[in-house]
Amino acid sequence: MPEIGAHVSAAGGPQRAPERGGEIGCDCMQLFTRNQRSWKVKPIAPGEADAFRRARAEHGIGAVMSHASYLINLAATDPEKHAKSQTALEAELERCHQLGIELLNFHPGAHLEAGIEAGIETIAATLNAICRNHPDKTDVCLVLENVAGQGSTVGADFAELAAILERLETPERFGVCVDTAHAFAAGYELHTAAGWDAMWAAFDDHIGLNRLVALHLNDSRPPCGSRKDRHALIGRGEIGPEAFRRAVTDPRTASLPQMLETPAGPEGWAQEIDWLRGCAQGNQPDLPEIEDRNINL
């Protein structure tokens, strides 16, 4: 039985997030520990970390994953932007360490005009530098997320994530989160039973299923192979419901924390969590009727 949850708001401080997760039935959750669209970072206030840990225990939240800022580009070719990106991810790592958050999810980056090989080399070198700078933070798993393949982003193909991992000095500090909408946009045909199996076979061949630490559960508005990142409500997009039934029952994924980033909003996430939990229990519940609130994560 997987832990099932969603990306919840940390408005008012990260210690507020577990209560919000508990209110919608989360077993696990994802959050931003900082303003994800600003380079400026407020320090963790005195008592905030202890309050977060207490709230997490009180509301029965299992796995917690922080999503790093969207501004970070570890493949940036501009020296100033690259330095800011490395500093920002190091700050995210420090915050997770302080709060006791065990998973730090991030997008690898975009190579711009440098080319995919140069992008992979830069990303890996930056991650190696971060780990050397923070040898005491092995309690936080650095989680590479696959991307949809828009523009010059790195990591749409599992082989690209594998190439980054192969260049790491401390690969044991890293894991991978697969976003279903991103994988679909990148061309993995997970909407069919055969395509679902083929996707995980490819993942195992390139990366190894032992490195899979979480799933982002999102349906997709655009069709397979679109290279466009636009999430849809569970079962209401181009992927359809069967892939999500598989996600919560397939032995390869059923033990993982699985987190929603759909445009449903908190009330809708509660219904999607109930539906997924019913599927995980072997039932065949009807898809809930949910308003698309255009929440973008």
UniProtKB/Swiss-Prot annotation:
Signal peptide: none annotated. One of its GO terms (molecular function) is deoxyribonuclease IV (phage-T4-induced) activity. Binds 3 Zn(2+) ions. SUPFAM superfamilies: Xylose isomerase-like. SMART domains: AP2Ec (SM00518). Keywords: DNA damage, DNA repair, Endonuclease, Hydrolase, Metal-binding, Nuclease, Zinc. The lineage of its organism: Bacteria, Pseudomonadati, Pseudomonadota, Gammaproteobacteria, Chromatiales. This is Probable endonuclease 4. Belongs to the AP endonuclease 2 family. Zn(2+) 2 binds at E145, D179, H216, E261. Endonuclease IV plays a role in DNA repair. It cleaves phosphodiester bonds at apurinic or apyrimidinic (AP) sites, generating a 3'-hydroxyl group and a 5'-terminal sugar phosphate. PANTHER family: APURINIC-APYRIMIDINIC ENDONUCLEASE, ENDONUCLEASE IV ENDODEOXYRIBONUCLEASE IV. Residues 1-21 are annotated as: Disordered. Zn(2+) 1 binds at H67, H107, E145. GO terms for biological process: base-excision repair. Zn(2+) 3 binds at H182, D229, H231.
